[in-house]
Amino acid sequence: MTILASISSIGNVKSISKSNNLSSLSNSSSSLQSMNSIQCGGCGNGGLLGAVGGLVGGVLTGTGVIVGSVLHGVGSILTGGSNNCGCN
């Protein structure tokens, strides 16, 4: 009886972690869309401005996307924002 109870509780933990992963994936995809909307606009908005927008978007939408926005921000600073034509 206790073995069955422990197995069922392990199954519940796995399903909870799967649902958490799915929700974090949906949060990251929506934040990526919001980051793309921040980057939309004319060409060469300036690398620093794009980096700040990406960092703020990452912080506001969740911790899972901060790494991606930091990397994107560093890339924008290095390239000077010259490839920010339209929506990236």
UniProtKB/Swiss-Prot annotation:
Organism superkingdom: Eukaryota
Regions annotated as coiled coil: none
Any Pfam family matching the protein: Coiled
UniProt record similarity statement: Belongs to the hssA/B family.
Protein name: HssA/B-like protein 17
Protein species of origin: Dictyostelium discoideum
